[in-house]
Amino acid sequence: LIIGEVWEDASDKISYGVRREYLYGEELDSVMNYPLRGAVIDFLCGRIGAEEFDARISSIRENYPPQAYYALLNILSTHDTVRILTALSGVAEPATRDEKAAFRLSGEQYDRARRRLFAAYTLVLLMPGIPCIYYGDEAGMQGFSDPFCRGCYPWGAEDCEIRDKVAALIALRKSSDAFSSGEIHTLYA
């Protein structure tokens, strides 16, 4: 299985002036689902509504071959991105390296981000594809983009509530194949 690190829609990617056939040639089996990450963050931070969120995740499902869609690596953070807890806080990234290194969410920012994080994990862990949790996200690690997202795991200082809720969602996912290989049908109320 070869999963590529393609940050955009891999079905229609143009790189260096050339259309790439990542999912339609003999290149990649699937990709890291950065479009899902962006849609989840934008939706939970209130930058897009439910219809736009649905349109963005539906375009992935519609554009990708089924075998690539069901093998998507569904991510919220990676070694190159802002940590999901920090991203969901809605705070602006500081301008300097020193400010980024020293930054920690306030209690109110952390609580807001954590509520959004529970919703984010619910969405990502119950979507078709392969969920991937970047080390420390399940423990409440914070950090801006590389290298500030690559800190040491907080042994002994984990946010146990996040860890326990993620574990419960993983158990729920394992309880039914519908979560990994089922279909999504949008219902509007």
Question: Over which residues does each language-model region extend?
Answer:
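Active-site-proximal helices and loops of the catalytic beta/alpha 8
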Residues: 1-72, 123, 140-168
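Catalytic-core region of carbohydrate-active enzymes that cleave or remodel glycosidic bonds
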Residues: 10, 46-139, 156-157, 173
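Carbohydrate-interacting/catalytic domains
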Residues: 18, 111-114, 126-133, 137-189
